[in-house]
Amino acid sequence: MVKSIRAPAGEDERKDWLVRFDDSGRKISGVGTPPFEAPIYTQIFKARPDVQAIAHAHAPMCIVLSLADRTVAAVHMQSIPFEQSVPFYARPIHIKDDAEGADLARILGQGRAVIIKAHGLVTAGKSIDEACMTALYLEGDR
């Protein structure tokens, strides 16, 4: 798996800041350390062979929706992937271990998105573009 990280202060932000890690969260190569929430990625990839990319963001509007116990409504063409409601992961925690990651993957099911209560969103796709655009549409579909 590959995850981008923020460029350290004073470093060139145009440079690729990527860390590559295995399915147990151990660093293989790259810059920095694997994210402590690596189980988000490892457990979804394990549960969903069709998924090739995952996006995780601390999206403010999704956080607000989760705190209000409101789901996303399909109100425009870009919200078609959310025609069926986006599930919530009800525990407002960081996903730090395999059991939590597997529980998140179970709640995601065959869907393209899940909102972690008071935390953010996770989207899954067949490409980086699909996972990222799904996240952008989800955050913009208030």
PLM features per residue range, with description:
Residues 1-142:
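Glycine-rich flexible loops
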